[in-house]
From Swiss-Prot:
Belongs to the NADH:flavin oxidoreductase/NADH oxidase family. NamA subfamily. Catalyzes the reduction of the double bond of an array of alpha,beta-unsaturated aldehydes and ketones. It also reduces the nitro group of nitroester and nitroaromatic compounds. It could have a role in detoxification processes. It comes from the Bacteria. This is NADPH dehydrogenase. FMN binds at residues 23-26, 60, 102, 215, 307-308.
Length: 346
């Protein structure tokens, strides 16, 4: 049976064997607090590649030591990180998957011993540190850090880079008027609030020729915050700059109550795909092959980002294929045990 979920998808010169993407999820497992890959990461990401995920995306990887969410985040702020990342990429590709990395800076959400930085001196909540408002020199240093991280990503062999512009981290903090109260060229109007991301994209594109994604929070869930309609303009600017796909998440720039339900963020991917004419990824409580297939058939998104379901089941692609009646090729090492996985949902 032909399916959309298991059809190839080509972005520039990179072809994914299917539309399933492992959503970037922080593992907080760099145990020596040096940002380096551990055996856990190799097994964690390698298993999903063996499970036949089309694009395995590594977690938020810090472009600066002070830009980590925690001391145990993965890092890419110096050349010593390349070797471990390279090994992980190599293992992913051995299993015919493509490898992506999410480049990130935590901004005011960094929970380290150092003082966090942000566009403005506004804490996320009353339990977190008041961040230091970034100087223009710090802004330029951070843009350079993203560029250097892109160079290292290329050296490590990644196929795709994603910029983390969501969930209340630094890029998102500049975009949202709730966290950006600057009065210079990096604050105020939508165009000014976009400037930080614009300059990061420009810097990355100078050294990176491959596919470039941006993850966004398409809704601030606040009456004075951003909505998906605001992101239509941002997405158009990103497309003009050569961004290939918008990964559509939501929330977490300020504390807010969010009603979640299966596929609750798909509407954002659909809206931006239609109104900004850019490829999108859907994410958020997508837990079955039938659900994922329907999103693609309805042209609501181009790729399906799967998070927690891949934590529960590293072989989710096989489960999804069984649901859809699609014959997924076994890894040759496992060919002595052909056939469908039992359907335990009944």
């Amino acid at each position: 049976m032909n399916t959309q979920l298991f059809s190839p998808f080509t972005i520039q010169n990179v072809t994914l064997k299917n539309r399933i993407v492992m959503s970037p999820m922080c593992m907080y497992s760099s145990e020596n607090e040096d940002g380096k890959v551990t055996n856990f990461h190799l097994i964690h990401y390698g298993t999903r590649a063996m499970g036949q995920v089309g694009l395995v995306m590594l977690e938020a990887t810090a472009v600066a030591a002070e830009g980590r969410i925690s001391n145990k985040d993965l890092g890419i702020w110096n050349d010593e990180h390349i070797e471990g990342l390279q090994k992980t990429v190599s293992f992913i590709k051995e299993h015919d998957s493509k490898a992506a990395i999410q480049l990130a800076h935590a901004g005011r959400k960094a929970e380290l011993h150092t003082d966090p930085v942000a566009p403005s001196a506004i804490p996320f909540n009353d339990k977190m540190k008041v961040p230091v408002a970034m100087s223009k020199e710090q802004i330029q240093d951070t843009i350079t850090a993203f560029q250097k991280a892109a160079i290292r990503s290329k050296q490590a062999g990644f196929d795709v880079i994603e910029l983390h512009g969501a969930h209340g981290y630094l890029i998102n903090e500049f975009l949202s008027p709730l966290s950006n109260k600057r009065t210079d060229e990096y604050g105020g109007t939508a165009e000014n609030r976009y400037r930080f991301l614009r300059e990061i994209i420009h810097a990355v594109k100078e050294v990176w020729e491959g596919p470039l994604f941006v993850r966004i929070s398409a809704d601030d869930y606040h009456p004075e915050g951003l909505t998906v309609n605001d992101y239509v303009q941002f997405a158009k600017w990103m497309k003009e700059q050569g961004v290939d796909l918008i990964d559509c998440s939501s929330g977490a720039v300020v504390p807010a109550h969010i009603d979640v339900y299966p596929g609750y963020q798909v509407k954002y991917a659909k809206h931006l795909k239609e109104h900004a004419q850019i490829a999108t990824g859907a994410v958020g409580l997508i837990t079955s092959g039938v659900q994922a297939e329907q999103i693609l058939v309805n042209s609501e998104a181009d790729l399906i980002f799967v998070g927690r379901e891949l934590l529960r089941n590293p072989y989710f692609p096989r489960t999804a294929a069984n649901e859809l009646g699609f014959e997924l090729k076994d890894p040759h090492q496992y060919s002595r045990a052909p056939g469908k996985i039992a359907n335990t949902s009944k």
